[in-house]
UniProtKB/Swiss-Prot annotation:
Belongs to the MAL family. GO terms for cellular component: membrane. Its main location: membrane. The lineage of its organism: Eukaryota, Metazoa, Chordata, Craniata, Vertebrata. This is Myeloid-associated differentiation marker homolog. The chain crosses the membrane at residues 19-39, 54-74, 85-105, 123-143, 156-176, 190-210, 228-248, 278-298. It comes from Xenopus tropicalis.
Amino acid sequence: MPVQHRTIVVGNTSTLKSPVGIVRILEVIFACVTFSLVVHTGRWGGRIGDLCMFCWCFCFAVTLVILIVEFAGVQNRMPVSWKNFPITFAMYGVLMCLSATVIYPLQYLEDKAYNSEARNYQIVAIVFSCLTTLAYIIEVSLTRAKPGEVTGYMATTPGLLKVLETFIACIIFVFISDPAQYERHDAMKWCLAVYCICFILSIVVIILCVGECTGWLPCAFNKFLSGYALLAVLMYASAMIVWPIFAFDRKHGGTPSRPSYCRSGQGNLYRVCDWDKLVAVAVLTAVNLIAYIMDLVHSARLIFITV
């Protein structure tokens, strides 16, 4: 009687036992616990709640996919650069979970009308959201490029700054479009053009790196990065000057101080009004300007790039 051999397929368990693999497992667990607790409380209705839920669920799903791909050892079959994609997503994971961790309690935890048990679940969910954010921060610190190391561009400081720049731009779009603050003056429309152009170019850089398409550029990649960073610094510097003038100067129809109707709102300790959004755009413009300046400095010093 012939001997039958059974083939046992064993995945790459070493990736799960590595420090990065362990951190990713914790990210999946923490994110799952977070959105499960929030769903249990039922306190996540509305656009802000949907946004927070999307952040936790999206991070959970993509991290789980990354774990499965690395466990199966099929990174080379994926249509993306595996030297760039995981670190890019990890950085987005930091920013998304951090935003949800800050926004959710401000919107839903202040309402004391709900019973203490529901609030306790919310507090625990916020704690696990903090842990999820911390786990992504650790992953970024473990996988980012070390001094002298030649790796994917997105693992370098300029690559991580690109992620930060696009995320901040997305937040600016939220504040500037509801209501359409830029329609107050043509100069503010210029600021909107600055945010859009720089956002699109940063996204293009990320897509080129993750998709391994940098060879499509008609010029050297490092020269393109330095030129774009310089252009972005100049454009954001102009927006940093123009936006506060036309948003807060009375001569141009602005409001220099917070209106009385913005003081408070029912059910919340703090109400975000249109004037607050103008301030938020000004602050985020300054933050992104600093990010682009750092990007320019690092891009000028970055000599060896492997995508």
